[in-house]
UniProtKB/Swiss-Prot annotation:
It comes from the Bacteria. The lineage of its organism: Bacteria, Pseudomonadati, Campylobacterota, Epsilonproteobacteria, Campylobacterales. Monomer. One of its GO terms (molecular function) is peptidyl-tRNA hydrolase activity. It comes from Sulfurovum sp. (strain NBC37-1). InterPro entries: Pept_tRNA_hydro, Pept_tRNA_hydro_CS, Pept_tRNA_hydro_sf. Transmembrane segments: none annotated. The active site is at 19 (proton acceptor). This is Peptidyl-tRNA hydrolase. GO terms for biological process: protein quality control for misfolded or incompletely synthesized proteins; rescue of stalled ribosome. It catalyses: an N-acyl-L-alpha-aminoacyl-tRNA + H2O = an N-acyl-L-amino acid + a tRNA + H(+). Its EC number is 3.1.1.29. Keywords: Cytoplasm, Hydrolase, RNA-binding, tRNA-binding. Gene3D superfamilies: Peptidyl-tRNA hydrolase. One of its GO terms (cellular component) is cytoplasm.
Amino acid sequence: MTLFVGLGNPGSKYEDTRHNIGFKVIDSLVDDLGARNISKNAFQGELYRIANTLFLKPTTFMNLSGKSIETVKQFFKIELEDIIVIHDDIDLPFGAVRFKRGGGHGGHNGLRSLDAHIGKEYIRVRIGVGKPEHKSQVADYVLHRFSEEEEKEIERLVKHVSNACKALLCEDLNKVKSYYSLKSIEGLE
């Protein structure tokens, strides 16, 4: 069984923020694949399923998302290497897309929570959301909407990452990485 997790914060207040790009990708996957909702509360998140693939949007808020993922992992007996986490990354320029297995949390509180609850060897799909001018602005930056110019590219970016995630269901990580990685939004056709 494969588990895709999109990191984000619940509620309309956060819906279109940089931190919620993972939720947007999960929504795209669920729509594209016709996955059905199997739980809104039992796993501290919205959980969807089609065949042997699960899609999770934790509703615990970003900093506690590891709890939700751990619950789903244990209930469905999912191996760590079969978990794919989609998240924002301020260390990448807007529109960059990177894939990797394991690694540190890089200051991302959602990843910090995951690492504490399930370990580090899951696959990460990192989506660049740009970086604020000063480190002290990070919390405000990720909790705000994309710029008007960036908003115009979000749909294409989300579709690209969604397609990459679908490829991960049948292709190996290195092959997906070589085909779908982007240095910035300019690399998106």
